Amino acid sequence: SIPQNCLPYISMVLHTCNQNHFYHDAVFFTLFTNKKKGLCMIQLEHISKKFKKKAVLNDISYTFEAGKIYGIYGINGSGKTMLLRIISGLVFPTSGSIIINGKTLHKEISFPDHMGLIIENMELQPQLTAFENLEELNKINHYATTSDIQDALRKINLQSNEKVKKFSLGMKQKLNIAQAIFENPQLLLLDEPTNALDTDTIGCLKAILEDLKKKNCCIIIATHDHQNITSLCDRILEMKEGNLYDKN
């Protein structure tokens, strides 16, 4: 179900994972981005997803607009992560359409080139510094400058010259966030971004998201952490048993 024009990039990422044998619980990886200042609007039209006879998502219709932060909360298994995978184009819906800036993804089999994408169990390279980890990711598309990398690490308050093998879980999570933002995506999808973060770092994350919002980035966060998501997001949605409810 992965779009063909996405496969070379996925292959490079997976090759890096296999070479280093070091995995982390979650990563927020900017797979495709560009420097164009276009707006990103996502329209979900009657999205349903089934595995065999089990319904995972039920007839979801919603529009996500540029320049806003959306929070989707729900318990494990509610369907929130599956919805993010479908929006990213890595999984196609059983029925319905995903339209990004007027292009229907599952019909045209095109992959957005301005997306910060979640990849579960993506590795960090322990023998490298935080800066070097971002440099390695930048080799995939070469959109970021040295200044972009340094700025992302500064915003999340992470030392650029310390090796990842010395990192605590919270520091690794900080690096995951830096990986998501250093190429300035127009669409950013985050799964459980506040995991292992202290209060100060959650404050840094909020400032980062507010900055991206001012640049008209469309940000969608999936989490079970209702308390922190309320302070981070403009609009709150609840995912329950495959149904999406607007709580505003």
Regions found by a protein language model. Name each.
Residues 73-75:
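The feature captures the beta-strand-to-loop junction immediately N-terminal to the Walker
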Residues 88:
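Helix-to-loop junction immediately C-terminal to a conserved catalytic motif
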Residues 96-111:
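Conserved ABC transporter NBD signature motif
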Residues 121, 127-140:
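Q-loop/switch helix immediately C-terminal to the Walker
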Residues 188-192:
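Catalytic Walker B motif of ABC-type/P-loop ATPase nucleotide-binding domains
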Residues 223-224:
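H-loop/switch region of ABC-family ATPase nucleotide-binding domains
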